[in-house]
């Protein structure tokens, strides 16, 4: 009889100065049969001692540590042992600059510590943390997407919770608008795309899965690097050429048509595809409000957020592009969008900015004829 060895568990090193947080993370990590806690330690020095005998597959790191702060520890890890790191921090406000710095130093993901108020929120937070850990290992293994999660989560809500579906309707010619969705690996990928755009770029609206309180710092950092203006979304903010609007963390972002132009709506509401903001919500609003005036772009990320409603965009006449597998950190969301029939073209990351500009020129030429 042939026997098969069980797949090796992903070993996680938890580094957090709070005993309560370490205990919480230990329970969360061990709720996933594919993950195991290698050690849970209170500071960077204890983490270094643990790593002398065994290297973890992923480090779950808080930024606020005694002795050596989390950013210094992260910098040393990347210099000595480039192990995937997921930063899980309660930082908001001014501390989010440190979270942006963590990404620039090489952290694979930055997520918020859970502040769950009920069983459903605790379950959703647990799933997001385990997903981030699993996705971090995938960035090293370069597989197309992690295996389906063995947990049994509650029902995954669709965009219907925020914006009801409706059959495609004719939409008048307006200015062009680009809608982008990204998740794991998206912060670096978005920087590559946006910094390659000239100030004359068409209007851009973005959902990047991020924690609450983090997107303002992310937008400021991008704005300092780009020829275009990059802003965190505010309700009724005008969508205009040379401007990219990034969804607030923990709030949905919708596109709204106003005469020949667009504004954005910022909404609370249920998690959609286990995310808030959700790419599906943005893409559905683009299908309904912009139709053939829109370009949808789905980029690196784990899961299927955006896949269903990118197909709605395409059915409504929009052009659609997925980032190719080779240039994705995690080829999850683009793969699912292709599987749902929503993708017109597949392009590498370094071609996306050019494709955005080509779309803007084609649309302008079409409308002036």
UniProtKB/Swiss-Prot annotation:
The gene is cheB1. GO terms for biological process: chemotaxis. CDD domains: CheB_Rec, REC_CheB-like. It comes from Cereibacter sphaeroides (strain ATCC 17023 / DSM 158 / JCM 6121 / CCUG 31486 / LMG 2827 / NBRC 12203 / NCIMB 8253 / ATH 2.4.1.). GO terms for molecular function: phosphorelay response regulator activity; protein-glutamate methylesterase activity; protein-glutamine glutaminase activity. It holds the Pfam family CheB_methylest. The modification 4-aspartylphosphate is found at residue 62. This is Protein-glutamate methylesterase/protein-glutamine glutaminase 1. InterPro entries: CheB-like, CheB_C, CheY-like_superfamily, Sig_transdc_resp-reg_Me-estase, Sig_transdc_resp-reg_receiver. Involved in chemotaxis. Part of a chemotaxis signal transduction system that modulates chemotaxis in response to various stimuli. Catalyzes the demethylation of specific methylglutamate residues introduced into the chemoreceptors (methyl-accepting chemotaxis proteins or MCP) by CheR. Also mediates the irreversible deamidation of specific glutamine residues to glutamic acid. Belongs to the CheB family. Residues 11-128 form the Response regulatory domain.
